[in-house]
A protein has these predicted regions:
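Pocket-edge positions in alpha/beta enzyme catalytic cores
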Residues: 15, 51-54, 79, 104, ...
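Canonical Radical SAM [4Fe-4S] cluster-binding loop centered on the CxxxCxxC motif
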Residues: 15-54
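Glycine-centered loop/turn positions within well-structured domains
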Residues: 33, 136-137, 262, 288
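Radical SAM/AdoMet-radical enzyme domain recognition
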Residues: 56-76, 83-196
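Auxiliary Fe-S-binding modules of radical SAM enzymes
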Residues: 2-23, 186-190, 200-339
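Conserved beta-strand segments that form the floor/walls of ligand-binding pockets within enzyme
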Residues: 22, 26, 75, 106, ...
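Conserved, mostly hydrophobic/aromatic
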Residues: 27, 35, 76, 105, ...
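A short acidic, helix-capping loop that chelates divalent metal ions and anchors anionic groups
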Residues: 44-49, 135-142, 204-208, 289-290
Length: 339
């Protein structure tokens, strides 16, 4: 029967036939920024208790089982991952797992200037830095921290030590930074690095999301193409972004469009939260507790069975979530999921 075949294959296949190959590991829900599209108001923040956060050894064990089931690429996230002390030790542990092909990280860049070299030595391949404005006052308004020069130094340091790829992610929000699209593109082009614009998603802690604030990817590419000759490269299988290459060879532009053009049909990503919950979809409302298995004597097979079952139940996609179709945001924070 179908259920039996799923278990015998021992791969992370869901009901739609999608196979998970990429994992995002959140190592903390804490962040020293307060980006308005991510974090709730300070008096409404409830951090995960320290004793509930997975240890590096527990993460290593879970990732090892996931690797045996076909996970090949790992991205370390937060909150802000570099708030986790000695993160390079975890990078080394994950990079040493035989079938893991790459370990990358997404960061706000605050600690990147200081940590880039040792992370690279530990086995970090590349880094994606969140950068939503190049204007100091606006950067502070969006992120809650006056830190633009420090973040920019972190990006340059990452390039200097040889992390590759270095990418920029920018969330485009109508009325906040949609007039900076060309400035952000030019900044990335000067460094010949990729920049990806992300549509504003209904996962903000402040509850400010609505469709009127979403800048569709089509609008972004129209803005860019009026200035820069672009060559469409399409969207690779299971990739989150559609890509355009600048014809003069100075980097490329990506669009991540979960709202206007969802890419759920061939999604190959799953997420592990900082407190050990497996999330098969960014917009899912069902968590699968792996920490309980790890801390209560579960065997490797127990862990694998729980993971395979969780992935099998992966939702069809964002377009099928009734709370999104109805146009309102779920009261759930991106920092707690893992960005």
């Amino acid at each position: 029967m179908q259920g039996t075949e799923r278990r015998e294959e021992r791969v992370l296949r869901d009901r739609k036939g999608r196979v998970a190959r990429k994992l995002r590991v959140s190592v903390t829900d804490r962040c020293n920024f307060a980006c308005l599209f991510c974090m709730p108001e300070k008096d409404k923040i409830s951090w995960i208790p320290k004793e509930e956060i997975l240890t590096f050894e527990e993460i290593e064990r879970i990732v090892g089982v996931l690797a045996s089931l076909g996970i090949e690429k790992v991205r370390i996230t937060g909150g802000e991952p570099l708030l986790r002390r000695d993160l390079e030790e975890l990078v080394d542990k994950i990079a040493s797992i035989r079938s893991i092909r790459s370990v990358d990280m997404t960061t706000n860049g605050w600690h990147l200037e200081r940590k880039a070299e040792e992370l690279r030595r530990a086995g970090l391949r590349g880094v994606t830095v969140s950068l939503h404005s190049l204007r100091s006052d606006r950067f502070a308004k969006i992120s809650g921290v006056d830190a633009l020069p420090r973040v920019l130094r972190g990006i340059d340091r990452a390039l200097g030590v040889g992390l590759n790829p270095v990418k920029i992610n920018s969330v485009a929000i109508r009325g906040y930074n949609d007039d900076e699209i060309l400035e952000l593109i030019e900044y990335a082009r000067e460094r010949r690095i990729s920049i990806r614009f992300i549509e504003f998603m209904p996962l903000d802690g402040l509850g400010m999301w609505n469709y009127d604030r979403v800048v569709p990817g089509k609008e972004i590419i129209e803005t860019a193409s009026r200035v820069y000759p672009l060559q469409p490269m399409g969207r690779g299988a299971s990739e989150t972004s559609s890509t355009w290459r600048f014809k003069d060879g100075r980097g490329d532009l990506g669009l991540i469009t979960p709202m206007s053009e969802p890419f759920c049909d061939d999604c190959d990503r799953i997420r592990l939260t900082a407190d050990g919950k497996l999330l098969s979809c960014l917009f899912d409302t069902e968590y699968h507790d792996l920490r309980h298995v790890v801390r209560n004597g579960g065997t490797q097979k127990d862990l694998a069975d729980r993971i395979v079952d969780a992935v099998w139940k992966k939702p069809d996609g964002v377009g099928y979530m009734p709370w999104i179709k109805d146009g309102w945001a779920k009261p759930r924070n991106m920092n707690a999921i893992g960005g």
